[in-house]
Regions:
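Acidic pyrophosphate-coordinating catalytic loop
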Residues: 233-237, 261, 306-318
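NUDIX/MutT-family hydrolases
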Residues: 321-364
Length: 377
């Protein structure tokens, strides 16, 4: 940091504060700066766009307006409100953390960094956001937006995900927040995040609208579009999966609950699973349903094929009505099984893919009785 051409933290902070205080977006979590609202919004915003988060935040706060109501809720209720937002471990951690805060801190989010970091799902970034935005403490934040802004302002040409660069970026973020007035830590951090979200975006940043373009080294060197450097992307693997829509004689649908641990843990959905290499879809329905719930089924009409991207892989979920040939459903490779009516389907915490199956069923007016040859008792 001894190089004379590096932007002074105080100059960057001053320009950012003037800009964010005049132009920040009106978002629902900014209208109430209490620690609970800050915490919920920051967790929801992890790897999720603001426009997506807003309705989920409003629905969450209507159902769980405080720590106590969240702690007292059932896991099913928490996952149902979260359903569709993805990365479901976040919801489970929020629930566990609320219960720990009630048990260990009397229902009050702690204002000490050490106590915050001891809670499940709280890392350095989330702790810094809560401490600065809600408590006004001079704690730095470093998310994807802030990382990009700092790499450009200081023209950092190293891999931003490397350990040494990560330490450097945290040091720069700390110097910036410490250079701001004592009561402006939250505004400064919000300015960094807002700038990265709206102006200093990936690809081609809008430098003409940037309040700190005049002190940005990457802009001065004409390399802003090249910062931060990007690692080569590998194409995520793709898998086909089966989802069996099974009805009983009363016209109820069979749902399974996934185990609490792992991807989509605790959520409900239609029985099935990932197809094996070389396995045709029809065979996949038979095998996955047998392994998961112990039923022998015969696939029938295809309902939908739904593509979906997760963080590290992609799937195409094939949904088909399946007729029971033999057996009674039992939770062999799932946490629970349940027969539910068509009207009850939307009351369960379903992943996006399974919710789309429900929508397809509603569009195509499925039969209320099993296909010919189904069980009679």
């Amino acid at each position: 940091m001894s190089r004379p051409n590096l932007p002074l933290p105080g100059a960057v902070a001053s320009l950012l504060l003037a800009w964010v205080r005049a132009d920040r977006r009106d978002l629902p979590w900014r209208r109430r700066r209490d620690p609970y609202a800050v915490w919920i919004s920051e967790v929801m915003l992890q790897q999720t766009q603001v426009t997506t988060v807003v309705p989920y935040f409003q629905r969450w706060m209507a159902r769980f307006p405080d720590i106590s109501s969240l702690a007292a809720a059932t896991s099913d209720d928490v996952l149902r409100i979260w359903a569709g937002l993805g990365y479901y471990a976040r919801a489970r951690n929020l629930h566990r953390m609320a219960q720990e805060i009630v048990a260990r801190h009397g229902g009050t989010i702690p204002s000490e960094k050490k106590a915050l970091l001891a809670l499940p799902g709280i890392g350095r970034y989330t702790a810094g956001a809560i401490l600065s935005l809600a408590f006004g403490q001079r704690e730095p934040v470093l998310d994807g937006n802030v990382r990009r802004v700092l790499c450009r302002v200081y023209d950092i040409a190293d891999d931003p995900t490397g350990a040494a660069t990560e330490r450097q970026l945290w040091q720069l973020a700390t110097k910036l927040v410490m250079s701001a007035p004592e009561d402006a830590a939250g505004d400064l951090n919000e300015g960094l995040m807002e700038l990265g979200a709206l102006i200093c975006t990936p690809g081609e940043p809008d430098c003409a609208a940037c309040p700190i373009a005049d002190v940005c080294l990457a802009h001065a060197h004409g390399v802003e579009a090249e910062r931060p450097i990007k690692r080569p992307r590998t194409r995520p693997p793709h898998y086909d999966a089966a989802a069996a829509v099974i009805l009983d004689e009363a016209g109820r649908y069979l749902l399974i609950q996934r185990p609490a641990a792992g991807l989509l843990g605790g959520l409900w959905g239609f029985p099935g699973g990932v197809l094996q290499d070389g396995e045709v879809v029809a065979e996949g329905f038979v095998r996955t349903v047998r392994e998961q719930v112990g039923l022998e089924v015969a696939p029938g009409d295809m309902i939908a094929s739904i593509p979906h991207a997760y963080t590290h892989f992609r799937i195409t979920l094939h949904a088909s009505r399946c007729r029971i040939i033999a057996g009674e459903p039992q939770p062999l490779r799932c946490a629970a099984v349940r027969w539910v009516t068509a009207g009850e389907l939307t009351g369960y915490a379903l992943p996006v893919t399974d919710a789309k199956i429900v929508q397809a069923l509603q569009r195509h007016a499925p039969p209320t009785l099993p296909l010919e040859g189904g069980p009679t008792g």
